[in-house]
Amino acid sequence: ESDFLSKPTEPAIARHRIDNILKTNRRLNHILQKQEALRIKSEVDEMTHLLNKATAEHAISHILLSTPEELHALFAIDIDNFKAVNDIFGHKMGDHTISVVACILASHFSGSDIIGRIGGDEFVAFMRDIASRQAVYEKAQELLDAILDKEALSIPENVTISIGIAFTEPYETSYTTLFQKADTALGNSKKSGKQCFSEYGVSA
């Protein structure tokens, strides 16, 4: 009798148990999907769909710590004249400009690279295990060129970007130090008239 209870042969009972299992699975899948959606939302910048500041920093730090012997490069990227865009054309155009720059970055870096928005009009991009510095210089120039077609991008004429680049030293594992170098190089690009890239430690 106990064997009959543990292995029901009545079709109605079997279907009921199967339905319960399927319902439970659907509920679990729904919960997992919601959890995954919340996780993604917590890691991604809502406007640009790039990584947010905390997630980008964490991802880059992980690579620096796990592959300290490799050559990596960090880009610090800033939209030139962004305050003027907001003041003259309004915040809607400002948001559009940020989204355009984000799309340019997303389309020019590979899936193994890390791209994040770290502030209002500030971004970082991280190229890992690079073969040569020349590849990084070429990537920076591609980005500068990509934003020049203002009409196609529907952005104001005065919008450009400035870029600062910092390469890792052997066994350099601090994201903070690397970012400070890239940010210093970005400042040099701004001082040089904007719409250009500069490398940390290299005089213009």
Which role does the model predict for each range below?
Residues R117, R133, D145-S162, K190:
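Catalytic core regions of nucleotide second-messenger enzymes
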Residues E1-S2:
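As written
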Residues Y137, T168-S198, A204:
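Catalytic-core segments of nucleotide cyclases and related cyclic-nucleotide turnover enzymes
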Residues L22, N86, L144-E151, D183-L186, ...:
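Protein kinase-like catalytic domain
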Residues P8-T9, D129-A131:
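Hydrophobic/aromatic docking surface of two-component receiver
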Residues T9-E46, A54-L64, I114:
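Signal-transducing coiled-coil linker helices
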Residues F126-R128, A166-T168:
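Short hydrophobic/aromatic beta-strand micro-patches
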Residues R39, N52-A73, D80-S110, G116-G120, ...:
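Conserved long alpha-helical elements within nucleotide-processing catalytic cores of c-di-GMP signaling
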